[in-house]
């Protein structure tokens, strides 16, 4: 039995989980609604404010899908209840971010400002000029949006300049030693 998959998912008050016969899972909560189609071989049941995920056999593919499906549904339940957020820091001289309406505009040392439109269900916040918070209810979209922002200036190992996640540790390298 999958160590992740065998655990039931507790459904908090105020959240409804529905599963159609073709494994379309809908989770509604105070922050919104998420719909995801799960693999047809995995059995999903909602009983007594718990979601129980079971697999039909012990084939390797079914074992893998068992834990994955349970984790995806759990992420949906947490997302509509609490939401997800990722914090990015801009490190470098002149690197800064600001909001123009819903659009994120960043100065990253290019000849032009970088403008990023939020995808559906994602919002940006800039509590400081060098800090960007990506918020949303879908964990996958929040991570993808944060990764899209980060790829504009990946942190470099010599000075540590670039866009990094809040608790990310950049492995630093020593520069060349000059001749004497």
From Swiss-Prot:
Assigned keywords, A-Z: Ribonucleoprotein, Ribosomal protein, RNA-binding, rRNA-binding
Instruction: Show the GO MF annotations.
Output: rRNA binding; structural constituent of ribosome
Q: Which GO terms describe its biological process?
A: cytoplasmic translation
Q: Which domain of life is it from?
A: Bacteria
Choose one Gene Ontology CC annotation of this protein and give it.
cytosolic large ribosomal subunit
The keyword Secreted is annotated on this UniProt entry: no
The subunit structure is: Part of the 50S ribosomal subunit.
Record's family?
A: Belongs to the universal ribosomal protein uL6 family.
What's its job? This protein binds to the 23S rRNA, and is important in its secondary structure. It is located near the subunit interface in the base of the L7/L12 stalk, and near the tRNA binding site of the peptidyltransferase center.
Write down the NCBIfam families for this protein, in alphabetical order: L6_bact
What is the name of this protein? Large ribosomal subunit protein uL6
- UniProt lineage: Bacteria, Bacillati, Bacillota, Clostridia, Eubacteriales
């Amino acid at each position: 039995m999958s160590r992740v998959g065998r655990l039931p998912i507790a459904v908090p008050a105020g959240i409804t989980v529905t599963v159609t016969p073709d494994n379309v899972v809908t989770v509604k909560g105070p922050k919104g609604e998420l719909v995801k189609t799960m693999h047809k071989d995995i059995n999903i049941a909602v009983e007594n404010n718990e979601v129980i995920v079971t697999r039909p056999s012990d084939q390797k593919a079914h074992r893998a899908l068992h834990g994955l499906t349970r984790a995806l549904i759990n992420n949906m339940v947490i997302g509509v209840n609490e939401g997800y957020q990722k914090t990015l820091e801009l490190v470098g001289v002149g690197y800064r971010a600001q909001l123009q309406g819903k659009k994120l505009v960043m100065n990253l040392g290019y000849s032009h400002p970088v403008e990023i439109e939020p995808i559906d269900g994602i919002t940006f916040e800039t509590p400081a000029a060098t800090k960007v918070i990506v918020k949303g209810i879908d964990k996958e979209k929040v991570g993808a949006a944060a990764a899209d922002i980060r790829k504009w200036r990946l942190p470099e190992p010599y000075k540590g300049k670039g866009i990094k996640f809040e608790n990310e540790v950049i492995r630093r390298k020593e520069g060349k030693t000059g001749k004497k």
